C-alpha cells in the first residue's frame, strides 16, 4: 500500500494526512506508520498486511472500548478501525522503554529508579483487573476459568514440542510448574496479557500514563500481568509491585510471587506458541533458540 493509498483511505474517514510518513516494518500482521494531519496532530497508523485481519481488528476495538471506561490511564483511541487501516492519535508521553529489533538496543525514556512507577502501575493493574466478567462476556472476549488455565498451557507445550522442539531442562520445569497445585490461583480476572515496560507509557518522572497493544486481553491468571515486570525490573521490584497492588485493593493469593517467576520463566514457551501460530521464519528461529533447540 502506497502513501497515497493510505491518504485516500484516511480521507474516506475524514482524516487528512500529510504525505510525510515514517514506517516500522517489523510487525507480522500490521505495518506501523507515523503521520501528521493538516492541524499538526500526530497519528499512529496500523496497516494490515493481510485481508483476513478484520475480525482481529474488531476484537481489539471492543477491548479498547471496554478498558477505556475503567482505566484512569490513556489507551489508544481508534478513530479509524477498518479492515484496511487503523488510526489513532499518538498517546501522550513515551513507552517506559523502547527496543530496537535490529540492533537490540534498549532506550529508557524514564528514570528506571523512579519511585513513581510501581505505585502508578499497581493502580492501573487494580483498575484493569477489577473489570467485571459480565462486561467481558457481553463483549464476546475470551474467558478462562481457573480450571482451564493449566490445560491450555499443557496443550501449547505439546504443540510447541511437536512443531519446534524443546530442551529437556525447560520441559521438565514447565511440567513441574503445571503439576504444582499450590502455585495456581482459584480465581481468574481480566488481564492485558502482554504487559511489560515497552507497552506502558510514562511521564519522564515515571508516572504511568498509558497502556498500548491490547490484542491479547482476556480473563485468565493475573500473574501474566506481573511477569513482564520481573523480566525488566527484577525480583525485588516485583515484590514491591505485588505489595503495592494488594495495598491498593488488588486481589492476590499466597503464591502470586512464585507463580509470577514461573510464568516469566515460561516466556520461551509463549514465544514458541506465537512462532507456530504466525509461521514466521524469523520468529521460528528465535523461538527455537530460546527453547534450547538446535536449528
Which role does the model predict for each range below?
Residues 20-142:
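ATP-binding pocket architecture of kinase catalytic cores
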Residues 1-17, 92, 107-114, 118-119, ...:
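An alpha-helical support segment within catalytic cores of ATP-dependent transferases
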Residues 15, 39-43, 207:
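Short acidic/polar mixed-charge low-complexity motifs
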Residues 10-18, 71-73, 253:
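Short secondary-structure junctions
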Residues 55, 188-190, 196-257:
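Active-site Asp-x-Gly
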Residues 276-282:
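Short helix-adjacent coil turns
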